[in-house]
Each structure stands twice: as structure tokens, then as C-alpha cells.
Amino acid sequence: MTMTANKNSSITHGTGGTKAPRETLSRSQSVSPPPVLYPPRSPIYPLSDSETSACRYPSHSKSQVLLKDRHSRNPSLLGQDPSPETSPPICTLKATSFSYLDRTPSLRKREDQKETVQGAVQDVEGVAACLPLAQSTPFLGAGSRSVLLSCTGTRAHSLGIREKISAWEGRREASPRMSLCGEKREGPGSEWSVSEGCPSVGCPSVVPSPCSSEKTFDFKGLRRMSRTFSECSYPETEEEAEALPGRDSLYRLEKRPGRTEPSALLRGHGIRKESSAVLSRIQKIEQALKEQPGRGLPQLPSSCYSVDQGRRKTGTLGTLEEPTGTASVSPSSRAGGVAGVAGEAGPPLDREGSASMKSETPGNSSSPQLLPPKSSPDPAVNPVPKPKRTFEYEADKNPKTKPSNGLPPSPTPAAPPPLPSTPAPPVTRRPKKDMRGHRKSQNRKSFEFEDASSLQSLYPSSPTENGTESQPKFGSKSTLEENAYEDIVGGLPKENPYEDVDLKNRRAGRKSQQLSENSLDSLHRMWSPQDRKYNHPPMQLSLKSNSQSLRSGNWSERKSHRLPRLPKRHSHDDMMLLAQLSLPSSPSSLNEDSLSTTSELLSSRRSRRIPKLVQRINSIYNAKRGKKRLKKLSMSSLETASLRDENSESESDSDDRFKAHTQRLVHIQSMLKRAPSYRTLELELLEWQERELFEYFVVVSLKKKPSRNTYLPEVSYQFPKLDRPTKQMREAEERLKAIPQFCFPDAKDWLPVSEYSSETFSFMLTGEDGSRRFGYCRRLLPSGKGPRLPEVYCVISRLGCFGLFSKVLDEVERRRGISAALVYPFMRSLMESPFPAPGKTIKVKTFLPGAGNEVLELRRPMDSRLEHVDFECLFTCLSVRQLIRIFASLLLERRVIFVADKLSTLSSCSHAVVALLYPFSWQHTFIPVLPASMIDIVCCPTPFLVGLLSSSLPKLKELPVEEALMVNLGSDRFIRQMDDEDTLLPRKLQAALEQALERKSELISQDSDSDSDDECNTLNGLVSEVFIRFFVETVGHYSLFLTHSEKGERAFQREAFRKSVASKSIRRFLEVFMESQMFAGFIQDRELRKCRAKGLFEQRVEQYLEELPDTEQSGMNKFLRGLGNKMKFLHKKN
């Protein structure tokens, strides 16, 4: 048996007449497949709004079951509220009679209806037997979707019908728990009525059920069932409808499969059982499609499943609200029986319809919908010739298809679109992208079903003046500006990563491949420390190789696989590539497939970007240290971490080593309290970027003392002149007095010479406030004949760029050789030149007699840290083991003194050792060549790095120097040391550092024929990469612990940063190293910088964070390891 209930039906009553009825429009829900009925031959015309009316009835009226018209626009009729004591008003449709009304008084009708209700069956499982209709039967228009539920009827016609239906019901194998009879009254004007219970006069169609004691029809339950479950019916094609002009056009009902054949009553009305079956219709449609696969869908009439043009212009969808005591049974628009409209009976909703459906609350409608057909090159059958039972929540609905039960998707009025004659084209959002460009990325629900092409235009990136692309505006307000590289943002891949998006087969089983470990871990590093979990991925993503990412319509699946929220700090390189791929960065729109594609693409780009030499260096560190780098830390564990865990003997550390570590920590803290707080060189350069290229240019000459046979250095030429006696000028005069000492640190050893090859060196001046100035010197013999004393050309600048000023000194030397008067105009034009940005070139116009006007181009390199560094000289003077000890002493900011015979050796080795500290900068006193007259500086209690000539060594030994490391560069030995230099660094990292430096020649030769970066193939590049990797291993995770305060300021989480490291030896090293001013200046620089270009270290850090594996132990392994540590500790104590 079948049962349907319509919530959008029209009530039409009228007096007799045989005119063809006018159709009424509504939406209906169905709980079972409706019968397939033949279309009427009479023309069907839709009603206009003026012809439609509706009546409202009280919810407590049990004697009359009526439904209002959903399309009524008559406010006067809608506002009526008749009392239960009076007969309900009758809705008329002009003069046209729609149904036959009983002429008995309304009181008689109510009495008959009460008798009908008494024997009704309460439960609804199956649904109503519908009687055949004549050709002129009303409600059979193609656009009609409603049938009247009424309890009115006459005793005259009901007796014979009761006998016939009783005979038909007697042939059933099982009696349904409840039946609902749609009855057709014979007469000039026919009327449909549905009554409950067998003893009713109005509907003697069903045998009473044992559970028919209740007298009230539960229309609420019927609403709930009809809203929840539905089996859709599919009307016949137009060809079949046209093929039946001569047949009897009675509509007939076909029962569900598994039930008995139609009753004798249906046969009595001339119904053909076999030809009208749903199965036969389906078979014919399938056969027609198989014979002509290219023909596509059969063209449906304009009145099928929708209103025609005249109606569509004025009609609106009915609302979902309905009086409590009303219900309806509706025929399918094409089938004409008691059934709902098929789910695919109509084109996909337009943009407005889709938006209104998304805004619908889950409580409004939980209407099911059909699954989309399997993807195939041929267009899908519309209607699909195979009904399916589905259930979906409202949030899961696909707005591209109509609800299968025909209910309006939302209470918002909207005109249903007509059914197109051809399949709908793929939906593209390109023309509308400007209309919704203002929407925020968090509000992505309306973009769930976008195609990839529209997503690629959501976040267009704009080129900046540097030639790179600016980061789009994402949901989070702040990003990690320190990752704004100028040199690593690559081009967009030519291939489209969304070419293989499967738009239809979204419910098929996922043929998955697991996200690679590196790609998945790279996503971990993009999260904030609070969100990041090192123990497991956020979800075990089951990812398809062919990404079907962006049109996954099942929102409940997406919610169950939701990723953790991305942090405010994204890697700029990741975000730039995401912008290029047009992937949104909001959590609701990054699903697993897009992450798979993006992560693999990111890792592949970065693996290509890492030079082979760097990969070999990294492999050495990985082999020595292992895979585990960071451990899982929650905020509670950071606060309650015990000292026992910090100092447990898990790495064979002895008590003596722990005591030495504690003493070292106390020593560096006490020493740094006495040292002034210096600022980083980078911050100083930021303040001077708008100033001149250099501060002073001086010429220093040796003058003989009158009383002695010795020479003293003096400034013989100065540019510019210090005219105004301001405070800055007085400080500049003090510096000028010290400059000659650094230009001639060995002045007492000089005598006039006839020949001398020019020598270039540099020094650094550190002010009381920590400001630094570089001195670039060229020592040479002036023009003339005979023995003479050399002189030094010196340029004082805040810019640390040795190559640029070497070119300036070459030009000065050339002009000085012609005439000293030519130096002044050149230096003036140079001072008026702008301060060059990294990688930029400035042009200086000069005039030279005999050569005319000239243009001198001065280029500042992108990275000048290795420009004036010669590691070859450093390895010539020192062994690898000695160099690592010196490096460790400098990291802990100890006092270091170099001693050498030559000025150039001291200068080269001092600058090279400081360059090993990159990305950190030495914050304390740094004098590559200390004049003998200033040797007392080595007695100061603060850290320093100074170089002394061998002639000053006897005096040095007499001075009361505190703890310091004295290195003789000529003999490769330590003059004085502290005996713990081998234990300052983590032992595994120290072993990797030593091995990589020992194999430097082998590593360079392996890459000599490769096409990798030329900079890395040099000795300077290799040594720099080896030490950079050391810092990456120790502090490379610092960016994960830079948080933003409410004011937008950055703050570094020191304890969380240190305790996140898995290795205890590295944690102990960090505990001391984090007290240094080098580390403080490094973090301060990262906290204060806004948007600046990054160097090599940030690139290597990003690559390192992608390599981090997920190695958090399980609870049992952690327990066993802790137990082993305790046993070892007790064993050592005993």
C-alpha cells in the first residue's frame, strides 16, 4: 500500500460541471513510490495568482481536513480563522467547478466524518489506495501536485466502493497497519477524498486494523514521516505519453514490488495491469537510452515538473509553516496519483535557490535527496529511472539538485525554474567572482561547491616593487613577516593540480595514498605551539591520488575530517604558494585532498631548491644525531616539568659534568651582568639606511717624534671637516683620535722604506652604546722617490661591505697617484650618493683629467656576510679540533685572544671566526688588530675578541688577564685555556660538525661538476653551511615559539622553546647559550622586525622544519624509558 502526504496542497471545492479543471501548483512529499499514471488528453493551463485562493483552518478541527494553497497571495483569505462550530469557508476558483460538493448540510457532513474517524487506523506504514480517474478528472494537470484530503462523502456512492475495495483488500497477503484511501467520487464534477477508518461513510475502502481504536488522525506524525523518508516515482517520458492517444486514459495505481497484484476493482475499471507498471516504463526508458546513447535525455513537456512561463513569472514557493491539524495527499505532477515529485524533476537550482537552501536551518526540512548518478560521458537520465531511498541531514544537501520529496528548500519565496530541454551545463562561478570578492575567507560555506577555476581567482596576488608577490589577506590578521623572503618565492608550476578533480564521483570509495611523512609534518610546523601535537597527525588522512578536493558536497564528512586551525604565523613560502595555487587558508576550506596536493608540491619544490652539498651536510648531521628533534609539550607539562627530568642521566652524563654545567651557567650570568647591553648590527643598519654611505674618510701618516727616533700615526687629511662643535662632533673627534692607532697598530716598528706592496685590512670600532663602525684601510707608499714612510687611506662606515669599499679605495688610490686634489671631489660625490639596498647598485659620476666624465658603479651584494671572509687562512692556521673549541668558547661569550706575526693574518682569522657565528652577531668588544698602546683592554672583565701581534706577547703575559682563551695562530696551539672547551657543545652535534669539516675537500669535489649553486661549491660556502646547520639543529625551531600579544607585539616563549628539544645535552647547551647577548639580540631582532628580506638561515630553518619527523613515544615506551633511567641512576649512586 502507498501513502503520501502533501504539505503544500490546495483545497478546491465547487459545484458540478464537466469543464476541464485548471491546475494548481504545490510541492509535496512522499513516503513511497507513486503510481505511474497516464497523462490527460485535455489541455492543461496553469492558474494565475488571481485564480488561486487558500483557506486557513484551526488546528483543533478534527472533522474537516483541509489544506491551504501554498501559492495563495490573497491576504484576506489567509487571514480567515473560522470557528469550529461553523462550516469552513469554501475556496472557489472563479466560476469553474473543481469538484463535486455534497449538497447535504454541513452538519450532516461533520457527523459522517466523525463516523469515519472512529474506525481509522492510526499508524502509517504504507499508503493509500488510489482509485482510477476519468479523463476529465481534476488535479491531473501536468503541473498539479496536490490532491484533496477530505472526510466528506456520501453514503450513496460509498457502499459499492466499500464492497469492491473490501474484495480487493481481501486479496492482500498482509494487512497494513494503516491505510489511507484516496477516493474519486463519480459524478459530473469529481472530488477526491481521503478518509481514515473503514466504517466511515466517506471512505469505505479499507478493512479496519486492530489498532484503529483511536479516532484522531495523527497528521504531525504523517508530517514527520513524509519529511524523513521518501521513495521517489518517475513519470513517463513524453514519447510514451504521445503514444497513447487512443487508449483509455484512466489513471491507475501500481502497487510496490513485493505486494500482490492489483485488485478486482482496478480490473473492473478497465485498467491494464502490465502495461502501466513502473517496471515496464523503466525498462522502456532504459532500452531507449541503450539504443540511442547519443540522443541524451528525452525532451519533457514544458508543463512537466514545473509551471510554464506564465505561471513562473508570478508564482512563488509556498512556505513551510502549516497549521497543526492539516495534511494533504498530492499526486505527482506527471503521474497524477497519490505520490510525490521525483527528486530530479527539475533543473538544478540557480544561485538564489542555492543560497536560500544553504541558509535553511536543520529544523526546517530534512528532506532526502537522490544520490547523483555515476559519472559517465553521457548525460544522466532525468528523471533517474531507479528510485532509491536516501536520508540526509539538511547540512548535507547538494544545492545542485532539488529535494526528492518536492518540498521547497526554505521559507524564502523563490520561483521554481523551468526544466531545460538539454542537460544543464557545468556550473562556473567566474562571472560572479567580483560579486562575492568581499566575503571573508572564514565564511566559506557558500563556496563549498565551487569549481577549481573559480577558486584560482579568489585570492589574486599582486606583484610588489621587489618583483615578488605580496601575501594575500587571509583570515588571520597577522602572518610571519620574518619569512618574507625575497629570493625563494618560486614561479607557479605549469601543470594544473586540479585537472583530475572528480566532480561527480564524490561518494565513491576513496582510493587513497597516505600523505608522505615529510609533507604531513610540514603541515604540523605551520601550526601554533598550542595547536601543534607532536605525538600524532591531526587525523589519519585517507587521500586520493586524484584530488577531488574542492567539490566535496558532504559537509558532515568535511566536519568529521576537519583540520586543526592554522595559526596566525604561516610560513611565507607556504602562503605564497598557496596563494598561487588559489587555495584558501581558512580551516573550513582546506580539506584533505587539497592539503595532499599542496604539501607534496611544496616539498617537491623545496627538495629541488636545496643544493646537493647542503643535502650531504644534512645527512651527516642526521646520521650523528638521529631523527628525534622535538618532543610533545603541552602548556601544563611546560609549567610542571621537573628538574629530575631535566637532569636525569639518560645520555651517560656524569655528576661532574652536571656540576660543570651549573658553574658555567652561573659564570656567564654573572659576567653578562657587568657587560653593557648591545644592539644587533641589523638594527643599527636599519636606522642608517636613509643616511650617507660613509661617515669619514681620513688619510693617516706617520710622523716622527722630536725627542725620540720613533713615529706616531696622525690624521693628515680628513673629509668632511668637523666644523660645528656639537655633541656628535665631539664624539666623532674622540673616534678620530682612536682611528690612527688602528691604522698603524705597529707604528713603533716602522722605518722609511723604498718599496712596499699595498695591503688591505679592516677593523671595527664599538661605541659605549654598542654602536659599531667598520674601518676599511689601504696601506701603501705615497708617490715619490727614495725611502719614505707608508700612509693609510681609511673609510669609516656603518655598512659592513668589504668589496664595495675596496672598490672605493682602488679609485682613491688611482686619483691620489695623479694628484691629492682629485680625491676631494670624488669623495664628495660619493657621500651624496644614496645608501644602497641589498642587491642594488648606485652610480657615482666623477670627472678625471685626461679621461673626462666617468661613472663608477657600486653594488651592494644580497648577502655580504662572507664577502671579506677568508676561511682558507683560518684552516691554514688552525686544525678542525682547535677551531671547534674556539667556536664553542665564542658561543658562550668568553674572552678570546689571537696572536699572529702578520697584520693580515690577524685580521683575516678574526673576521672569519666571527663569520662562523652567523646568524648571530658578536655583541662585545671586537678588535681584529689591537694596537700595542691599547693592550690594557685585555684586562677588562667583559667578553672580547682581540688580535695581537707577536711583538706584544711578552707584555701580554705580564698582565693580570682573567679567564681567557689565548690562541697562537702561527703554531696552532693554545697559550692559555680553561680545559672544558671540548664539553661546551652537545657531543653528537660536535661530532657531526667535526666530521663535516674534516671531509670538506671531499664534499666540494663531489659537487664540482654538478649544476648546483656556485656559492656552495666554494670553501667559504661549505664551511658556512656546516655551521649554519649546527644552529638550525639547536635553535631552528625558534619561530614556532614566537607568539603575538593583544597589542600585536611579538613575544618569545623561552622555556617552551628550550623544553621542546628532545635531547637533554642540547637543552643544557641552550640553557647557557640563551643567557648570552648574542641570542638575546637575535630574538630581539626577530621580535621587532616587521617586513624584511630574509637570508640564508631562514631558508635552511624552513627546510629543517619540513624534515622534522613525528617521533613522540607511546605512553608505555615512555614509562619503560623512565624506569630504565631510574635504574641507571640508582646503579651509579651505588
Swiss-Prot record:
The modification Phosphothreonine is found at T228, T361, T479. Residues 1-90, 233-273, 289-571, 633-658 are annotated as: Disordered. One of its GO terms (biological process) is positive regulation of ERK1 and ERK2 cascade. It is found in: Cytoplasm, Cell cortex; Cell membrane; Recycling endosome. The modification Phosphoserine is found at S30, S32, S230, S365, S542, S571, S619. The keyword Ligase does not apply. This is DENN domain-containing protein 2B. The lineage of its organism: Eukaryota, Metazoa, Chordata, Craniata, Vertebrata.
